[in-house]
A protein has these predicted regions:
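Structured functional modules or segments
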Residues: 539-605
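Core active-site phosphate/anionic-ligand binding loop and the adjoining beta-turn-alpha structural block
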Residues: 215, 240, 248-251, 255-330
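Conserved, mostly hydrophobic/aromatic
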Residues: 14, 117, 173, 224, ...
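Terminal or standalone catalytic/regulatory effector modules within metabolic enzymes
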Residues: 36-54, 291-296, 300-532
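Glycine-rich phosphate-binding active-site loops on the catalytic face of alpha/beta enzymes
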Residues: 117, 177, 223-242
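Catalytic cores of alpha/beta
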Residues: 156-162, 210-225
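N-terminal amphipathic alpha-helix/helix-capping segment at the start of soluble metabolic enzymes
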Residues: 1-18, 66-71
Length: 605
């Protein structure tokens, strides 16, 4: 008898692997009937991950969106599932236990059937509480194994992890191959090993970027996998997922029982996805995200990071080449920097304990590698700049790292007086719901049906306040308008070559900003050349001051929160003191004094 394999449409992840936003609730409600009409999905991923936060960012209520979006699937008998980050809930930072408990109650009440829980460190201590919270709320608990490829992430490692989760009460297991770098044969062995422990439902999630995932899908199905996550045009492949049509045809040929696809409905959904992209979502999707990229195999970074990674490269390449120009050194190309970055990821990753390269730890490893490359290209030492959130990972505050830290990292932590933590990560984050209840009462805000508004405020405080004030909607509409104008005014390569340019030119050691224009130009429209680094206070006399230069470019901040006191001109500092921050690559990076002395000027460009 043919063995059945069922499909799940990862509609939420399709969008967020391609760009920043997801469709609005009116668009979701419009497309849902056609997805149902396709007749081939047992499950649909409706929310979780960044879905709720993204709704807040464009000024919409995520609670209304989840309720209205899940409703038609329930009526059709299709299960809905969401992604959650265990200790981090629906955000990038740890969440108190009382907020985590409320999370599952709210989402079940809103219509989500299954919670797919993962810990970015594969620390089962962060996942196991979610099993209990999900069951208390009436949800199916699907626990994830974050797949990566390293000497310690073996078949035995993953089968043992699954065993611990099954013994703790997991209803299902997800093989979460978020970077698509799991090797097909090994993945098949993992599935077979889990099925020997218990005949539990297994769902395979993968991304297409490196090129392994079609072979991986076939291997896991032959080993007993029950559900396959799929995407569909025009958002499949590239940084997205294998396409439904291809997967269905392959598995049918291999002898599996798979559902038929209503192609008329498929074309309706396909055309609506394109319609939503043309509306505003396409403004946030790079055409390069449709491309496969085997360069990702060696560093193991998720394909969904490539858009932000290339933007980071462009910014940091400019900084490196400014440094080289001042010293009459040969410039570096983007390809050279990319290979240096990938090589540095390979160096950094084992030394910080082999964290699985999944959100947020993939960003941490990439950022740390980029910091090292920037520092070394500018004549400084590796590990000179490690952001606080990366230190939290290294010190064990987010969970136990799979591998051992390198002696050089341990020595640096001890030199800086940092303490390692091996307790339960949840203990670091006390309950906070009462605090948010009081704040909502003071603001006269309704806690919402099933306390769903209270939950959103506690999970995403800053974004929720921006949503309530209307600022989020205002900022979003302004950004959409700006992007539409930029798209309409996009220049051709020839026009770009002849476009007015602003350059930084070094004259006797002093950088000046100059405008270069082509053809007939009205001088009144040009900004006068000026010092590229305007002083905010009188600088020290020539020859007396020493520069402290940021190794990377970004947004300048004197402090990163209200609890810190900003440094001032005239203040004495010691070598190693934090003097300011540069926000780059989604992280506040501390800039430290390189000498003992007195601040004589604060300069920012």
């Amino acid at each position: 008898m043919e063995r059945e394999v069922k499909f799940s449409l990862v509609f939420r992840d399709m969008w967020q692997s391609a760009g920043k936003y997801v469709p609005r609730v009116d668009q979701l409600v419009k497309v849902a009937p056609a997805i149902i009409e396709m007749g081939c999905f047992a499950r649909v991923e409706t929310n979780g991950g960044g879905f709720e936060q993204v709704n807040l960012l464009f000024g919409e209520n995520p609670n209304r969106a989840v309720r209205e979006w899940t409703k038609p699937f329930h009526e059709a008998g299709i299960q809905t599932h969401m992604l959650d980050r265990a200790l981090n809930g629906l955000r990038m930072s740890p969440v108190p236990a009382d907020v985590r408990k409320l999370f599952y109650k709210v989402k079940h009440a809103q219509g989500t059937d299954i919670t797919r829980t993962f810990c970015g460190l594969n620390d089962v201590r962060n996942i196991i509480p979610s099993i209990g919270y999900a069951h208390e709320a009436g949800m199916i608990s699907q626990c994830s194994l974050c797949i990566t490829f390293s000497p310690i992430h073996t078949v035995e490692y993953y089968v043992n992890m699954a065993k611990q989760l099954i013994e703790a009460g997991a209803d299902e297991i997800c093989i979460k191959d978020m970077a698509g770098i799991g090797r097909p044969v090994s993945l098949g062995k993992i599935v077979a090993g889990i099925k020997k422990i218990k005949n539990i439902p297994i769902q395979y999630h993968s991304h297409a970027g490196p090129g392994f995932n079609m072979a991986s899908i076939l291997e896991v199905c032959q080993a007993g996998c029950d559900y396959i996550d799929v995407g569909m045009e025009p958002l499949s492949w590239g940084t997205g997922h294998a396409d439904l049509i291809s997967v269905q045809a392959m598995l049918k040929d291999a002898g599996f029982k798979v559902p038929e696809i209503n192609m008329e409905a498929y074309m309706k959904v396909r055309s609506m996805i394109q319609e939503f992209m043309d509306d505003f979502l396409g403004l946030y999707i790079s055409p390069k995200n449709r491309l496969m990229n085997s360069l990702l195999i060696a560093p193991g970074l998720p394909g969904g990071m490539m858009g932000s990674l290339m933007a980071d490269l462009e910014t940091n390449l400019e900084s490196i080449n400014k440094y080289k120009a001042k010293r009459n050194l040969p410039f570096m190309t983007q390809d050279e920097l990319l290979i240096k970055l990938f090589n540095e990821v390979a160096y950094v990753w084992p030394r910080v304990g082999y964290p699985p390269l999944v959100t947020p730890f993939s960003q941490y490893v990439k950022n740390l590698a980029m910091m090292n490359v920037m520092a070394m290209e500018k004549g400084k030492e590796r590990w000179g700049m490690i952001a606080d959130d990366i230190w939290d990972m290294i010190l064990g505050k987010a969970g136990r790292l799979p591998g051992k830290l390198a002696p050089e990292i341990i020595e640096k932590a001890e030199r800086e007086g940092r303490k390692f933590f091996d307790g339960n990560p949840q203990d670091n984050y006390p309950d906070q719901l009462e605090k948010y209840r009081k704040m909502m009462l003071e603001k006269q805000w309704d806690k919402g049906q099933d306390d769903e508004e209270l939950f959103e405020y506690a999970m995403h405080p800053a974004q929720y306040e921006a949503y309530k004030s209307g600022k989020a909607k205002e900022d979003f509409l302004a950004d959409v308008k700006k992007r539409r104008e930029e798209k309409a005014n996009a220049t051709t390569p020839v026009e770009a070559e002849n476009k007015t340019k602003v350059l930084t030119v070094d004259v006797n050691g002093q950088p000046y900003r100059v405008t270069v224009a082509y053809g007939a130009v009205d001088p009144a429209t040009l900004t006068a050349a000026s010092g590229a680094v305007p002083a905010q206070a009188a600088p020290a006399p020539v020859g007396e001051g020493k520069d402290v230069l940021s190794p990377l470019e970004g947004k300048f901040f004197l402090v990163k929160n209200a609890q810190e006191t900003p440094k001032k001109v005239g203040e004495k500092v010691n070598k190693g003191d934090v003097i300011c921050y540069v926000e780059a690559m989604k992280t506040y990076n501390a800039i430290r004094a390189e000498y003992d002395g007195t601040i004589t000027a604060i300069c920012a460009n």
